[in-house]
From Swiss-Prot:
Official protein name in the record: GRIP and coiled-coil domain-containing protein 2
This protein's encoding gene: GCC2
Subcellular location: Cytoplasm; Golgi apparatus, trans-Golgi network membrane
Keyword presence, Nucleotide-binding: no
Keywords, alphabetical: Acetylation, Coiled coil, Cytoplasm, Golgi apparatus, Membrane, Phosphoprotein, Protein transport, Transport
Organism annotation: Homo sapiens (Human)
Length: 1684
């Protein structure tokens, strides 16, 4: 069917039709084209995803990377994109070249397709013959197949019902497992007992903490005593600090004055720059033409401004002589500005180039659009011209009708022959089916149980897989939800940016969808055509049935056919004339085909041009997409800048908060300094350090003044960097101080001298210069100085924060300006996009119009074709009629002309004869006169001469009378000829009427021919369906067998596994319960230890966390500084692009105005310092409390460690028990491995069964091959018959033509003979008369020269007439002999024809009888099949009921065991609670005994399942030592009792209500272990026996297969000649596909084993092992039947 579908798909692409190029391509090329498009779409998608990922990375990147790096990255990206663009253009060019090559290849393939199409038509004729033979087979097999299918479906439904019931049972078991889980949850509720123990331990910890607190209070008293001693020294130091503070304030005021002066100068510079920038903005907005000129002016203005700035800076340097570094800074600034200007110029040039590039692209696109429009109009005109040419191509189908007429006669004969063959094949198939059904019934009964077992095992495996999959599904759902949340967040962020891309992508998708939709519509049309053909096939089948009913009218029709055949002989002459006409028409057709090929080439060219147009459209769309992406990138860039600004503001707020925290820490440090001021030695060291710090502060003050001047010359970025670096250093120093102070608190009593050195270090780090001589001064003055320096630093920090805020405001303004400009650019780009979209819409509309016009043209073409076909048919009919009429007319005219010629000859002869007679008479009179004048002797005898004259006169009179009579006769002949003419005319009219009747009959015959052809096509389709359904039947039979085997195996495996699982589960549950109790106890103890350790670790971590927080804050501060630096660098570039200088000047003005606010902020900062000092004191108190808690927790830890040691001893005991349990688990694993071996054996059995199935399939293939041979022979006979019949018909027609021609010649010869004889007789009479006259008249003078001449002429005529007579007589004899031979041949042919008719009638009768008998047999088979199905269903129901009873029994037993386990668990929980309440001082021996008791009790309580319990009947119970379990009457219970030798096997009430003794538990344990060992031994024995039996089964099966193969070989021994030919062909052929085709034949003949097959296949492949192999018997059919 696939081949036919492909043919049907390829057929529309004939040269006559003008369809698109995609339709002309084959299916594989179309698929490749679609794949290429999908790859391009995927590439675009991947590119989009990569861009989105990069956007997300840029967003997720910290602000530290800076906008400068981003700009660099973006520029690099831009360059990369431009390179990619160039590469894509090159790829486009290469793709164009490839496309051109592909088109050429397509054209070549079209030509090849044409040749292949011709070959296909030839093969199609051969296939039609085969299909007609196989048609009847299909009908019978279809009915059988439908019945078998219905039965198999019923069986499948029953199997599915059984599986559903089993799944319900498994659900019930899952519910029971859920109950076990609930019991485990109840066990966890026991934990409150352990929690009470934890509370007891916590009380002990509280006691230890109280003790630690007492020691801490003692230490605090000692510290207070020391602090009072140090306070005096601190007071002296504070006074000195106040003095230094006053000096420092004066210096700060002087620096502030200098800063204000420099700020005013800077404002003036900024104003100038702002004016310049405004001018630049106005010039840019004016027009794009004057950009370059104005840009140069701006550069000159900027340079002047920079020179002015340099002059101002020089003036400042004169004013501020102390600042030597100002000039260098100004130069650096100028260089920096020049660099930024160059960068701006480069960016500006890049933007200009892009704008020009876009304009050029737009112009090119417009030109392309116009060019495409012009091309389209030209193409339209060409198409209109070509339509006219296509109309001429419609005359091709005339030849097809004549071919079909010739095929009709052959089809009728083949139909009868196929009916006979079908009946024979049906009988053979019935016998085969009966054998197969009997074999299937036997195998089904034996294999049903095996397959049930296998199905049960598979069901269990599938359920486990289901549970795993559900868990995985839940995990996947959770992951999916988390991912979905993340994706929603990302989608909200990327919604605006990806909106336009998605819209454009959707438009592309819609275009592709429309293309796909068009292709689908074309496919649908193809399928509709296919459906229409199927409908015609059905209709032909109905007409075929009608034809069968009309066969009764055959004898009557045969009589008419005979009559018609006689008439056809007359018309065969006209056919010869038609042949000449046909040759002329064929010459015309050839010329038309050439014109058609030219037209097709032109169409191809037009399609190529259309493809180019589409590509240009796609390029335009890509450019639009790129522009849209650029717009989106600019928008994204602006949004990123806004985010960065927001992040900067957040970072500044965080830094301020960190400063507050640092201030608080400083206050705490000040408090600590007061505490430590009691030591005099420390104070003296501190005073020195303070003096040093004062000196450092003065140096720092000078450096700050210089830094301020540099700050004024440089940009705000440099100031921020310097201050931030200073703040970082100070923060680091503060962190170090905190660490030192913590160490001092711990080692205060031991290391007083170390504290002094730390204070000196602290003061040095603060920057104050304190001399060693000032140790004796008050410490208070030193502290005051330190406080003042800190206050100044805080004020500076506030100033810096204020300045940062101002810079942030400036940045926000700049960002707004950038946004406005970006909005303007976006609007421009949007306008461009709108223009492109409008152009795109116009182009689409034009395309739609073109397509609509194309469709209209195609519809017009179809209409014209239909009209042309109709007219052509009418013309042909008219030509046939005209030719027939012309032939009849020509015949009648020939006849009339002959008659007219005959009449004219008679009329011409009359005057000639009369003239001759007159001449003769005149001559005679002249002679008489001469004789009278000359001879005087005549006078003497007057009487004698008178008498002679009288006699002559009488003779003459007689002759005249005779002539008159002849003339009358001639007149009568003329009258008769006229009458014959009238009669011939009447006959022509009757012939015309007969011609019309023959034409009507001919039309009827052509209609019947068409019906027969359609019937043949339907028969073809039916045969294909039959092949498909037979293959499906085989597949479904195989499936049914496989399912049955699987069901048996699964049921067996289920039984075995259920027995094993029940025993293993019981043991495992006991072990798991014990392990869980031990683990829970151990875990609880470990949890307690871990909690104590965690509490300790938490305290340590809190201390470390504070240190880490300090370090993190310092690092964060450093990162923020770096981020600020990078952002400022980027902002400088952007400011220069958007005339940054104006805003900088305005900001400087604002700075000058806001100097008054600085003092207010300094006051706020001092307040914050005080609050921070208070917070520091609070934190110190908290640290002391925490240290006390640490001591308490250490004591608790010691107590817990003692408890841990006791618990570890108990854990070791539990571990010993666990090892024993593990040994038991190892044993169970071994048993599971044995069961897996049994499963592998089952799988081997399945493989052997599959081998048997393959053997049966091979038999089927052998039968198919035999069928193919018979069909090929039949086809050969049919062809031979056909050729012989056609030869006979040709010879008949030739002989008939010759007979007619000879008859006409004979008639003509007879007519000529009659005329010649009459003329001869007349001449004879004349000659005699002349002789008589000469004899009578002995006058020599009478013999004149005239008489001699007439005599010679007459003699010549006589000779000629004699020759003609002889020729005509010879011809007559030849014609008579030929006529006789032809008549004899005609008689023999008629006899043969009659015999054939009689034989066909007899064969039809026989076939009908056979059909009736087959139908009766079929009914019998159906009844037998239904009986077998009912028997099988009843057996299946019985098995199902028994299985259900077994499952119910197992469920009841399971429920009982669960109830007993629940009761035991409740008891165990109570006992555990009692054991926990008992003191821990109990000896380990008692604990071991209690555990053993528990284990033994658990072993005795749980029922032990035997492997043989499942196979027992319903009345029997399980083999257990439990008191509740029913006593079994089987032999296995007795063997266990003998092994155990214990009196406790009797039925007793449940023992777990009372507490068991140690001895009872030991006895029960020993009994259970013995029973388990006994069961293991039995299992091993049964497995060993099973393995031996499986090996025996394998051997037996292999022997059975070998014997079966021998029997099948004996069958094929009858056809040894065929086997010899096949083997010879296999040996002499080269290794490859041809050898592989012979493999199934050799396999079926010799019945090879799978190993032998493999070897033969390897030999057949040879070097071409990897080549493709043909499958099935159909591939061999072609090579065998000779139908390649």
């Amino acid at each position: 069917m696939e081949d036919l579908v492909q043919d049907g798909v390829a057929s529309p692409a004939t040269p006559g039709t003008g369809k698109s190029k995609l339709e002309t391509l084959p299916k594989e090329d179309l698929i490749k084209f679609a794949k290429k498009q999908m790859m391009l779409i995927q590439k675009a998608k991947s590119r989009c995803t990569e861009l989105e990922k990069e956007i997300e990375e840029l967003r997720s990147k910290p602000v530290t990377e800076g906008t400068g790096d981003i700009i660099k990255a973006l520029t690099e990206r831009l360059d990369a994109l431009l390179l990619e663009k160039a590469e894509t253009e090159q790829q486009c060019l290469s793709l164009k070249k490839e496309n051109i090559k592909m088109k050429q290849e397509v054209e070549d393939s079209v030509t090849k397709m044409g040749d292949a199409h011709k070959e296909l038509e030839q093969s199609h004729i051969n296939y039609v013959k085969e299909i007609e033979n196989l048609k009847n087979e299909l009908m019978a097999v279809r009915s059988k197949y439908s019945e078998d299918k219905a039965n198999l479906q019923k069986q499948l439904e029953e199997a599915m019902n059984t599986q559903l019931e089993l799944s319900e049972q498994l659900k019930f078991q899952n519910n029971s497992e859920d109950n076990v889980k609930k019991l485990q949850e109840e066990i966890e509720k026991i934990r409150p007992g352990f929690e009470e123990q934890i509370l007891y331990l916590q009380k002990q910890l509280d006691a230890t903490t109280d003790e630690k607190k007492e020691t801490v209070t003692q230490l605090q008293n000692i510290i207070e005593a020391n602090s009072q001693h140090y306070q005096k020294n601190i007071n002296s130091l504070q006074e000195e600090l106040l003095q230094l503070k006053a000096i420092h304030q004066e210096e700060v005021k002087e620096l502030m004055c200098q800063i204000e002066a420099s700020a005013k100068e800077h404002e003036a510079e900024i104003n100038k720059l702002n004016e310049l920038k405004e001018n630049l903005v106005k010039q840019c907005e004016a027009s794009e033409k004057n950009i370059q000129k104005k840009y140069e002016c701006e550069l000159e203005n900027l340079r002047k401004a920079t020179s002015n700035a340099n002059q101002d800076n020089q003036i400042c340097s004169i004013l501020l002589q102390e600042n030597t570094f100002v000039e260098q800074v100004v130069n650096e600034k100028v260089k920096h500005l020049e660099d930024t200007l160059k960068e701006l110029e480069s960016q500006h040039s890049i933007l200009k180039d892009e704008v020009t590039y876009m304009n050029n692209l737009k112009l090119k696109l417009e030109m392309d659009a116009q060019h495409i429009k012009d091309e389209f109009f030209h193409e339209r005109e060409d198409l209109e011209f070509k339509i006219n040419e296509l109309l001429l191509a419609k005359e091709e189908q005339g030849c097809v009708i004549e071919k079909l007429k010739s095929e009709l006669a052959g089809l009728n004969k083949q139909f009868c022959y196929t009916v006979e063959q079908h009946n024979r094949e049906v009988q053979s198939l019935k016998e085969q089916h009966q054998k197969e059904i009997s074999e299937l019934n036997e195998t089904f009964l034996s294999d049903s149980e095996k397959e049930k077992l296998t199905l049960m095992f598979e069901i269990q495996g599938l359920k486990e897989q289901c549970e795993n999959l559900q868990q995985e599904k839940q995990e996947a759902i959770l992951n999916y939800e988390s991912l979905r949340e993340i994706m929603e967040i990302l989608q909200t962020e990327l919604g605006e940016s990806a909106g336009k891309i998605s819209q454009e992508f959707e438009s592309m998708k819609q275009q592709q969808a429309s293309d796909v939709h068009e292709l689908q519509q074309k496919l649908r049309t193809a399928f509709t055509e296919k459906d229409a053909l199927l409908e015609t096939v059905n209709r032909l089948q109905g007409e075929n049935e009608k034809l069968l009913s009309q066969q009764e009218l055959v004898p009557e029709l045969e009589n008419t056919i005979k009559n018609l055949q006689e008439k056809n002989g007359v018309y065969l002459l006209s056919l010869s004339q038609r042949d000449t006409m046909l040759k002329e028409l064929e010459g015309k057709i050839n010329s038309l085909t050439e014109e058609k090929d030219d037209f097709i080439n032109k169409l191809k060219n037009s399609h190529e041009e259309m493809d180019n147009f589409h590509k240009k459209c796609e390029r335009e769309e890509r450019l639009i997409l790129e522009l849209g992406k650029k717009v989106e990138q600019t928008i994204q860039y602006n949004s990123e800048l806004e985010q960065k600004v927001n992040e900067l503001t957040g970072g500044l707020e965080e830094t301020l908060k960190e400063k507050d925290q640092n201030d608080q820490k400083l206050e705490k440090l000040m408090v600590q300094m007061k505490v430590l001021s009691e030591d005099k030695e420390v104070l003296s060291a501190e005073v020195k350090s303070l003096y040093e710090e004062n000196n450092k502060l003065s140096s720092e003050k000078k450096q700050l003044s210089r830094d301020l001047e540099v700050f004024l010359s440089q940009k705000e970025d440099v100031i921020l960097k310097e201050h931030i670096t200073q703040l970082e250093k100070k923060l680091q120093l503060m962190v170090e101080e905190q660490d030192n102070l913590n160490k001092l608190l711990e080692n205060e009593q031991v290391q007083k001298l170390f504290v002094k050195t730390q204070l000196y270090g602290f003061l040095k780090e603060m920057g104050s210069e304190v001399s060693e001589d000032s140790e004796e001064k008050d410490v208070v003055n030193v502290l005051q100085a330190v406080g003042e320096s800190l206050a100044k630093i805080n004020e500076e920090k506030c100033n810096l924060a204020f300045q940062r805020d101002e810079k942030v405001l400036e940045l926000e303004k700049e960002i707004k300006c950038l946004q406005e400009e970006s909005v303007v650019q976006c609007e421009e780009l949007k306008s461009l996009l709108r223009d492109y979209e409008q152009e795109k819409v116009l182009l689409r509309k034009e395309l739609e119009e073109i397509q609509s016009e194309k469709e209209a043209l195609q519809s017009d073409l179809l209409e014209m074709k239909n009209a042309n076909e109709k007219t052509r048919l009418e013309n042909q009919n008219l030509l046939i009629q005209v030719e027939e009429v012309s032939q009849t007319c020509s015949k009648s005219e020939i006849h009339n002309e002959k008659e007219k010629c005959f009449i004219k000859e008679h009329e011409n002869l009359k005057p000639l004869l009369e003239q001759k007679e007159l001449r003769d008479r005149r001559a005679e009179l002249i002679l008489l006169k001469d004789s009278l004048a000359k001879s005087p002797s005549v006078k003497n005898d007057p009487l004698s001469s008178v008498k002679e004259l009288e006699e002559k006169i009488e003779n003459l009179e007689k002759e005249c009378k005779e002539k008159e009579e002849k003339i009358n006769k001639i007149k009568l002949v003329a009258v008769k000829a006229k009458k014959e003419l009238d009669s011939s005319r009447k006959e022509t009219q009757t012939v015309k009427e007969e011609l019309e009747s023959l034409r009507s009959e001919k039309d009827q015959l052509s209609a019947s021919m068409r019906d027969l052809i359609q019937g043949a096509e339907s028969y073809k389709n039916l045969l294909l369906e039959y092949e498909k359904q037979s293959e499906q039947l085989d597949v479904e039979k195989e499936r049914a067998n496989n399912f049955e085997h699987r069901i048996e195996d699964l049921t067996r495996q289920l039984r075995n596994s259920t027995l094993q699982c029940e025993t293993i589960n019981s043991d495992n549950e006991d072990l798991l319960a014990r392990i869980e109790t031990l683990q829970s106890n151990a875990k609880l103890l470990e949890v307690q230890i871990l909690e104590v350790q965690r509490a300790k670790a938490m305290v340590d971590k809190e201390l470390e966390a504070e240190k880490l927080q300090k370090e993190q804050k310092i690092k964060e501060h450093a990162t923020t500084v770096n981020e600020l630096e990078e952002l400022q660098v980027q902002l400088q570039k952007q400011k220069k692009q958007l005339q940054k200088t104006m805003q900088e000047l305005e900001l400087v003005k604002k700075d000058a105005q806001q100097t008054t606010l600085m003092n207010m902020e300094i006051a706020d900062y001092e307040r914050l310092m005080k609050e921070l000092n208070q917070k520091l004191t609070n934190k110190n108190n908290k640290i002391e409390d925490l240290e006390q808690e640490i001591k308490i927790q250490k004591q608790k830890q010691e107590t817990l460690q003692e408890e841990i040691t006791s618990l570890q001893s108990s854990v070791q005991q539990y571990e010993e028990k666990n090892t024993k349990i593990k040994q038991l688990l190892v044993k169970t694993k071994k048993e599971l491995a044995d069961s897996k071996q049994a499963e592998t054996d089952h799988l081997i059995l399945q493989a052997s069964l599959k081998g048997e199935l393959e053997a049966s399939q091979q038999q089927v293939e052998v039968y198919k091959i035999q069928l193919a041979e018979i069909t090929s022979e039949k086809h050969k006979i049919h062809e031979h018959l056909k050729t012989s019949a056609e030869q006979h018909q040709r010879t008949l027609s030739a002989y008939q033509q010759r007979v007619t021609a000879l008859q006409e010649e004979c008639r003509a010869a007879k007519a000529e003979q009659a005329t010649v004889t009459s003329e001869f007789e007349s001449y004879k009479v004349r000659v005699h008369n002349v002789l008589k006259q000469q004899k009578n008249k002995s006058m020599s003078q009478a013999e004149t020269e005239g008489a001699k001449q007439e005599r010679e002429h007459l003699e010549m005529l006589i000779d000629q007439l004699k020759i003609k007579l002889q020729d005509s007589q010879n011809n007559l004899q030849i014609n008579v002999s030929e006529l006789q031979t032809l008549q004899s041949e005609h008689d023999t042919l008629l006899e043969r024809h009659n015999k054939m008719l009689q034989e066909t009638v007899s064969k039809e009768a026989e076939l009908r009888e056979k059909l009736c008998s087959i139908q009766s047999e079929n009914m019998m088979m159906k009844s037998e099949h239904t009986q077998t199905v009912s028997q099988l269903t009843s057996q299946n129901e019985v098995l199902r009921n028994s299985f259900r009873d077994q499952v119910r029994h197992l469920q009841e037993e399971h429920r009982k065991t669960v109830e007993t386990l629940q009761q035991q668990l409740s008891k165990m929980e109570a006992q555990l609670f009692q054991l926990k309440n008992e003191p821990t001082t109990r000896s380990p021996v008692s604990s071991q005994q209690s555990l053993k008791n528990l284990r033994e009790r658990r072993n005795t309580d749980l029922p032990l399942l035997d492997m043989h319990t499942v196979t027992r009947e319903e009345g029997e119970g399980m083999e257990t030592t439990d008191t509740e379990s029913v006593s079994s009457a089987s032999t296995y219970t007795q063997s266990l009792e003998q092994l155990l030798n214990s009196p406790e096997t009797k039925l007793e009430p449940p023992l777990w209500h009372a507490e068991f003794t140690k001895e009872e538990l030991v006895q029960k344990l020993s009994s259970t272990t013995k029973s388990a060992d006994h069961l293991n031994g039995l299992l091993r024995e049964t497995e060993a026996t099973n393995a031996i039996l499986m090996e025996q089964i394998k051997l037996l099966k292999s022997e059975i297969r070998r014997l079966e193969r021998n029997q099948e070989r004996e069958k094929s021994a009858a056809n040894l000649e065929y086997l010899k030919n096949v083997l010879l062909q296999f040996i002499f052929l080269k290794p490859g596909s041809e050898r592989e085709r012979l493999l199934p034949v050799i396999n079926t003949m010799l019945q090879l084993s799978p190993e032998e097959k493999g070897k033969l296949a390897a030999v057949a492949q040879g070097e071409e092992e990897n080549a493709s192999r043909s499958s099935g018997w159909a591939s061999y059919l072609h090579s065998w039947s000779g139908l390649r």
